[in-house]
């Protein structure tokens, strides 16, 4: 499922692309490969330690277009005001409950509670609201999770569209866990700014 995210961005050579919550860098490197390493890609994650894996993966694959930045993606505009409306593509693979990965992580049954899900919602909202000012006009934002919970997915996007009427929902997909193929449950929304 994770490999289906990067193509949703429809990245183009020359684009400026932001991968928020990027570590360990699989999606950023996939994006770089899709554009032939001909874009400016920023991989942002709060964990400087985890970002080292992004740099290592990019180096291993010979990709020079990926820049790593340790920062809270929800507050990037405060840290980098020059980034306002400067990204044609933004990818947010948001922190989530992971309920779509129960087949691979059965322990989640015991750690995910209604309270823990409610605790994630403000963080997801803050990331979405914090990243939108960085999106260029006509830019594309992809929101993705590995959960099947509607509060983290469809309801989060419905609320975002109410708060930001300049956004248009271009595509939405909910994949359910598939025992036959071993695929995880996964959600994605492709949004375009007017």
Identify what each model region corresponds to.
Residues 1-194:
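S-adenosylmethionine
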